[in-house]
Amino acid sequence: MEGINLNQIGVSFKGSGSYVPNQILTNQEISKKVETSDEWIKSRTGISQRRISGLSENVSEMGYKAALGAIEMARWDIETIDLIILATSTPNDLFGSAPEIQSKLGAINAVAFDLTAACSGFLFAAITATQFLKAGSYKRAVVIGSDQLSSYVDWNDRRSCILFGDGAGAIAIEGTNELDNLLGFSMRTDGQRGSFLNLPSQNNQDLIINDINFSSGGFSSIKMNGQEVYKFAVREVPLIIDNLFKKTNFNSEKINWLLLHQANQRILDSVGERLNVSTEKILSNLSNYGNTSAATIPLMLDEAIRNKKIKENDIIATSGFGAGLSWGAALIRWG
């Protein structure tokens, strides 16, 4: 859809949705595959189980179902959506899975594209969407985080296979000329530390014609230096949120909720402690779903909204962090 040049000064958050596969993989079941135990996994990660996609499920299908939930909560007509951004690192079409979601929704007036920033992806995508809306280019946006990391896990590596699950979440955002509910944001990247967490390409030489080498593309499994990623998260995430507090004249007492990327319960607890955020304000569903990458924040958000935990006008400090290395934070007022 063409830009509509509205006089919008802010955004409002109109709806949320989520979807997780039916298949549940427990710690006990993983312990039959690798040398580990339920107690070992829970004590180090806080995870008890995770959802795994079935053969007929993929990023587009999960993202579509999450988006539908957000659109229904917002009570929008599908044709009024201008923008769809899919945050994913595991598209079922490497050229982009957002157009497939657009097609499934029937959102014929929306431009749709993928954004890749790993576990920071949803936050980065949501911030990107708000800037289009605040510029007056579009009126209504759906932002989706959907990932299927189970397809890229080395199921013989107990350090990483215990962490990840599949799922999707989405939010509906609308441009407004009233109060801006995006109170502030910050985004950062440090590519020099990218090797701490990555999913590298893997090329295989297949054919030689006239001394020209041809290779088929592919990817290996997730590579992670858990200790370095932990140190990165507990150092950088409190810092970026605290700096955002200072810029917006907020503090830990003025927020209602702390919503972090659901990577590891130890990280959530440590960040909360460093920010002096009380435990009851820290949102966590990590035990049930594990790390669903770009889906963790909207999945937790939707769960808290539908359980009537998060209410209209609640102030939420949120942060995504992960591969890149990338990290960011946003302060929002829900509604």
Curated annotation (Swiss-Prot):
Highest taxon of the lineage: Bacteria
EC number(s) on file: 2.3.1.180
Metabolic or biological pathway, per its Swiss-Prot or TrEMBL entry: Lipid metabolism; fatty acid biosynthesis
Region (ACP-binding): 262-266
Reactions that this protein is recorded to catalyse: malonyl-[ACP] + acetyl-CoA + H(+) = 3-oxobutanoyl-[ACP] + CO2 + CoA
Disulfide bonds listed in the record: none
Main location class: cytoplasm
Keywords for the protein's UniProt record, in alphabetical order: Acyltransferase, Cytoplasm, Fatty acid biosynthesis, Fatty acid metabolism, Lipid biosynthesis, Lipid metabolism, Multifunctional enzyme, Transferase
GO biological process, one term: fatty acid biosynthetic process
Localization of this protein: Cytoplasm
GO cellular component terms, A-Z: cytoplasm
Catalytic residues (positions): 119, 261, 291
GO molecular function: 3-oxoacyl-[acyl-carrier-protein] synthase activity; beta-ketoacyl-acyl-carrier-protein synthase III activity
Function: Catalyzes the condensation reaction of fatty acid synthesis by the addition to an acyl acceptor of two carbons from malonyl-ACP. Catalyzes the first condensation reaction which initiates fatty acid synthesis and may therefore play a role in governing the total rate of fatty acid production. Possesses both acetoacetyl-ACP synthase and acetyl transacylase activities. Its substrate specificity determines the biosynthesis of branched-chain and/or straight-chain of fatty acids.
Family, per entry: Belongs to the thiolase-like superfamily. FabH family.
The record's note on its domains: The last Arg residue of the ACP-binding site is essential for the weak association between ACP/AcpP and FabH.
Subunit structure: Homodimer.
NCBIfam families (alphabetical): fabH, PRK09352.1
The protein's name in its UniProt record: Beta-ketoacyl-[acyl-carrier-protein] synthase III
